[in-house]
Amino acid sequence: MKSIITEYINEDKRYQELNEVFGKENVLVTGLSGAAKATIIAEKYLNSEQQLLVVTNNLYQADKLESDLLQFVEDSEIYKYPMQDIMTEEFSTQSPQFMSERVRTLTALAQEERGLFIVPLNGLKKWLTPVDMWKSHQLTLNVGDDIDIDEFLNKLVNMGYRRESVVSHIGEFSLRGGIVDIYPLIGKPVRIEFFDTEVDSIRDFDVESQRSEGNIEHVDITTASDYIITEDVLKHTKHKLKQAYEDTRPKIEKSVRNELKETYESFQLFEAEMFDHQVLRRLVAFMYEQPATIMDYFKEDAIIAVDEYNRIKETETTLVTEIDEFMQNLIESGKGFIDQSFLQYEGFENLLKPFAVTYFTLFTATMPVQLNEIIKFSCKPVQQFYGQYDIMRSEFQRFIQNDYTIVVLAETETKKERIQSMLNEMHIPTFIDTPSRRNEGGSAIITEGSLSEGFELPYMQLVVVTERELFKSKQKKKPKQHKTLTNAEKIKSYQDLKVGDYVVHVHHGVGRYLGVETLEVGGVHKDYIKLQYKGTDQLFVPVDQMDQVQKYVASEDKSPKLNKLGGTEWKKTKAKVQQSVEDMADELIELYKAREMSVGYKFGPDTAEQNDFEIDFPYELTPDQSKSIEEIKQDMEIERPMDRLLCGDVGYGKTEVAVRAAFKAVMEGKQVAFLVPTTILAQQHYETLIERMQDFPIEVQLISRFRTTKEVKETKEGLKSGFVDIVVGTHKLLGKDIQYKDLGLLIVDEEQRFGVRHKERIKSLKNNVDVLTLTATPIPRTLHMSMLGVRDLSVIETPPENRFPVQTYVLEQNTNFIKEALERELSRDGQVFYLYNKVQSIYEKREQLQMLMPDANIGVAHGQMNERDLEETMLSFINHEYDIIVTTTIIETGVDVPNANTLIIEDADRFGLSQLYQLRGRVGRSSRIGYAYFLHPTNKVLSETAEDRLQAIKEFTELGSGFKIAMRDLNIRGAGNLLGKQQHGFIDSVGFDLYSQMLEEAVNEKRGIKAEKQDAPEIEIELNIDAYLPAEYIPNEQSKIEIYKKLRKIESETQLMDVKDELIDRFNDYPIEVERLLEMMEIKVHALHAGVTLIKDVGKQVEVYLSEKGTTDINGETLFKQTQPLGRTMKVGVQEGKMKVTLNKTGNWLDSLKFLTKSLEESMVITDEI
């Protein structure tokens, strides 16, 4: 992956001199800054065959370095060992992203692979599993291997995998019959099928559908944790822990000895089958006879580079002090033990002693070792031009006069062309991509790429310029291909029922789901869904009627009242809701008609300026953004006024879509009003528009409290005269005193946050102006159906490419953690949201934090402040006048502070899932990694739902996947916003799904649209045979319900075959009860196509009844021929004008019934409908 830059560097004498000693002797290299240093390191790696390690000060520096190295080295060869501060990593439940990267790195090292390894100081000093033990737990399975299954499953547990009944998350495995499913930390989920002890087949499978996707010949299974814990390790840990407990007990206050005993006993309880790696990792110091560090994993000839030695040394001193304090606190509070360390205490340079080390520092500094050589480079930063044409031209001409080669990095082909035409106008000799031939100096080469900054190497006569210097755009992070978590943790349908969930039975009302039970009725076994109603009432619903039962979903965490079986209460409730839904449908139909009649302005196709404007956008659009822009432009180009809702998660790029629509309107001489709910948002949107429109003659103005009376007056005059093209503002824009010369587009941000009066004004504008509404609250898809034609909808569900998943930690509240998280964010010049949801003591909380962080500026924001103070506080935070803001949930919506990338939430267990998700959306909104710490009180036993909630938010670190979880809670909120507050009560009384269904039916009925066929026509099959899914075959109730649902929907033999394949694929060969169930389904398929309505078992016979239509469509002659093999066991008659076929139950009568129903199907006269 050679690049033009490294070609130039490779020919340089200074570099060649360094190359000679790099990795062979102790060397000091000075003078190189960020990107230039990365270039030198990359070139060394590309010119050698060895492993190369770079030690950085912290994870932030490691990330920066990685971004630059990706420009030169294939991403498959770069390995980062991401370590946060050690205590947070060891004491919290955390998201799997970092863990998978660490495991990938250790595995590559254990297999002695060549690579470029980046390790922050914390990772270098951390205690690890001994190398040999790690190597012995890397599993490779091939088809045909003979293995001891028990030993294999034990190894998985040692490696950190958890045994579950169904595999749905990373780090889980399950055993069903002879099938083992595993979801490794790296790679796809795999299904291994055994024939006795032989590996019969290995298949990839999809966790969402649980179906296999294709056969593979072998699979490598990496560990699911960065520690291996075998039974021997567990014994050794308990033994060492006992010693540590006995050493610690006499040295602490008597008052906390009980606490220490509890801590000790909770660890001693762990058994090999059920221990939790996440908890036991705290005892790493007691685990191994000889713990390793990452340096033990490197080959002897590895090349070592240290980035800014003095800075690392400083960090190390602080780190050791902090950990000492932290451990002291733990010991004094009875939560920790003497000698319970997490890292190697000696200076980090001792770990590097066996190797020759190259130290990079910007300035000359004293080193801890005897240096063999000092090599000085001279490197200058490139001036920031930020689009200032004249400065750029004079600087570029200086380079040309001095015979420099200028390498300009552009991130896309379009940008390359744009930069080329710009340089041509400056008369600079320009080439595009000439990697192989060395140009003479005095010219520019434009090539695709991206670095964090440009640099000038005067003695090489080389300068590298990036888009950052040219246009102020940020470096786009190259996505790394080996991230395995993309869409891996998709949420299963929210309809998954768990015992104890509330459900709605269409005819009986709200009950509670108690599970699936197999009952014997009249000597026959069948599965039933058991529901609890008011008092002791219970209802058993046969699984073939399960479509009448839906999960109850309503406002978050709200428990409904159970209905009484057989009472009138449910009927009354449904009647009320029906009436409300009818009225709602009338209103929607009226809106639809009015909209179809109204006439607006028809915009023309895109102009050349539009194209230029769109090319200027520094990032790639996501597919959803492109689609939304396309839909909006199509709306604008027709006569009917646009009324489109653009729905997308926080920070997913809705603003850019709106800005492009605004530009299109202005290009045709129309004015645009951008209406937002708060002054701060107005300010932020205004700044975005100013920045995006700066190269075009477009007048953007703002009307808000932050403007003087004179400025507001001038803006109003400008709107009236047509001088102002775009105005941004709060509800003031809707005032009667605002007159537009020619308003063509109204953009409304978060319409639901405006009052009734303002909404009415917006509605009146909709009659002849194009309206685009933006919202971050997901709107339920079920409601899209009923709203169809009333309002158009665009959805952005994919995140922008260079946003990282927010690293999420769930941990007990602890002052040390908090201090550390604050210090780390402030040390990278970032800001922190500290969420404390108790207004009465919020100022005390600020004082506590001020004592922890005396040098930080800390602000407070809460909903009881007056609006002006609140806005000014938030604005100060946005402008970085505060480092930390202690706030209530008021930050949940709308404020965009890209520089705030740490969120700490106290008492996170008290929040609902959607709230936690939306709050977490406040951070990780730039190209930096965001961190969210969800704290819960120490010693508090979390309720099961709180635990589930925190677990869910932790697992769904993948961007946009939280959108899927929160969908449930937010949908209801969205439904209320869309349909009006008064509908909320009705949604809660019957549950969200039944409400949506009723509304859709009402709207369709009024529009004369026939409801689509939801399920197969009902055929009653009553046969006295055991036909069900036994618990021994499918132990997991959720999986059982899922299969029953699929069986209910079967309408063809192909679908039946598909379910048969799935059963064998997931659960292995099926028993006789399942075989009979599938035979009944086959009978149902044939009967369905033959117009059969009922198949009934009556003693020694089975009766088959046809519908009137089925009777008339049967060709009697064909049927007679087809059924001859059945002979006298079959009789055909007619009852009330409908055919009735009687079959004697002799021999294998179930096969005869299959044959009969198939013959009936084949004897049908083909008509258009069944």
Curated annotation (Swiss-Prot):
<dbReference type="InterPro" id="IPR003711">
    <property type="entry name" value="CarD-like/TRCF_RID"/>
</dbReference>
<dbReference type="InterPro" id="IPR036101">
    <property type="entry name" value="CarD-like/TRCF_RID_sf"/>
</dbReference>
<dbReference type="GO" id="GO:0003678">
    <property type="term" value="F:DNA helicase activity"/>
</dbReference>
<comment type="similarity">
    <text>In the C-terminal section; belongs to the helicase family. RecG subfamily.</text>
</comment>
<dbReference type="InterPro" id="IPR005118">
    <property type="entry name" value="TRCF_C"/>
</dbReference>
<dbReference type="GO" id="GO:0005524">
    <property type="term" value="F:ATP binding"/>
</dbReference>
<dbReference type="InterPro" id="IPR011545">
    <property type="entry name" value="DEAD/DEAH_box_helicase_dom"/>
</dbReference>
<dbReference type="GO" id="GO:0003684">
    <property type="term" value="F:damaged DNA binding"/>
</dbReference>
<dbReference type="Pfam" id="PF03461">
    <property type="entry name" value="TRCF"/>
</dbReference>
<dbReference type="InterPro" id="IPR004576">
    <property type="entry name" value="Mfd"/>
</dbReference>
<dbReference type="GO" id="GO:0016787">
    <property type="term" value="F:hydrolase activity"/>
</dbReference>
<dbReference type="Pfam" id="PF02559">
    <property type="entry name" value="CarD_TRCF_RID"/>
</dbReference>
<feature type="domain" description="Helicase C-terminal">
    <location>
        <begin position="810"/>
        <end position="971"/>
    </location>
</feature>
<dbReference type="Pfam" id="PF00270">
    <property type="entry name" value="DEAD"/>
</dbReference>
<dbReference type="GO" id="GO:0006355">
    <property type="term" value="P:regulation of DNA-templated transcription"/>
</dbReference>
<comment type="similarity">
    <text>In the N-terminal section; belongs to the UvrB family.</text>
</comment>
<keyword id="KW-0227">DNA damage</keyword>
<dbReference type="InterPro" id="IPR037235">
    <property type="entry name" value="TRCF-like_C_D7"/>
</dbReference>
<dbReference type="GO" id="GO:0000716">
    <property type="term" value="P:transcription-coupled nucleotide-excision repair, DNA damage recognition"/>
</dbReference>
<comment type="function">
    <text>Couples transcription and DNA repair by recognizing RNA polymerase (RNAP) stalled at DNA lesions. Mediates ATP-dependent release of RNAP and its truncated transcript from the DNA, and recruitment of nucleotide excision repair machinery to the damaged site.</text>
</comment>
<keyword id="KW-0067">ATP-binding</keyword>
<keyword id="KW-0963">Cytoplasm</keyword>
<dbReference type="InterPro" id="IPR001650">
    <property type="entry name" value="Helicase_C-like"/>
</dbReference>
<dbReference type="Pfam" id="PF17757">
    <property type="entry name" value="UvrB_inter"/>
</dbReference>
<dbReference type="InterPro" id="IPR041471">
    <property type="entry name" value="UvrB_inter"/>
</dbReference>
<keyword id="KW-0378">Hydrolase</keyword>
<protein>
    <recommendedName>
        <fullName>Transcription-repair-coupling factor</fullName>
        <ecNumber>3.6.4.-</ecNumber>
    </recommendedName>
</protein>
<dbReference type="GO" id="GO:0005737">
    <property type="term" value="C:cytoplasm"/>
</dbReference>
<keyword id="KW-0238">DNA-binding</keyword>
<dbReference type="InterPro" id="IPR014001">
    <property type="entry name" value="Helicase_ATP-bd"/>
</dbReference>
<keyword id="KW-0234">DNA repair</keyword>
<feature type="short sequence motif" description="DEEQ box">
    <location>
        <begin position="749"/>
        <end position="752"/>
    </location>
</feature>
<dbReference type="InterPro" id="IPR027417">
    <property type="entry name" value="P-loop_NTPase"/>
</dbReference>
<keyword id="KW-0547">Nucleotide-binding</keyword>
<feature type="domain" description="Helicase ATP-binding">
    <location>
        <begin position="635"/>
        <end position="796"/>
    </location>
</feature>
<dbReference type="InterPro" id="IPR047112">
    <property type="entry name" value="RecG/Mfd"/>
</dbReference>
<keyword id="KW-0347">Helicase</keyword>
<dbReference type="Pfam" id="PF00271">
    <property type="entry name" value="Helicase_C"/>
</dbReference>
<feature type="binding site">
    <location>
        <begin position="648"/>
        <end position="655"/>
    </location>
    <ligand>
        <name>ATP</name>
    </ligand>
</feature>
